[in-house]
Amino acid sequence: MPRQLPDLYEPASHDIVSISALNASLSWIIEQSVKKIYIYKKELTDYAVQRLSELSSVTLFLPENRKNHIAIISLTHTNYRPEELADILDNDFDIAVRSGYHCAPYVHKLIGTEDSGGTVRISIGYYNTKNDIDSLINALRELD
């Protein structure tokens, strides 16, 4: 075991696979351009918020200033606890979302979702499409 710095903090091999994956990821982002990725995800986020706002059974938790809001949307449903809704969307509709407190339990105390199990979080990625969002909306409508 190394006893001197910096070897003391790096006694094992470097994670070459992760380093290579990070390099490939950064190369892809540069190739696509951060601006292009941002614009696309912003358009999808705005579309999702607009469509979700049409559903009376859904409550959205959004920032007051949505100018730079992209990719993450938290919601609750009047008929289901977050973990129930996430399970139904996954098992019955093949839609992946996350439920719970999302590593931020104090935020849920602040927004009033602490006792109901948190929220359902939708994460929009670059490879998502409006059809994916429409599938989510159709699933939520079917559950009303």
Region spans (language model):
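Pyridoxal 5′-phosphate
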Residues: M1-D144
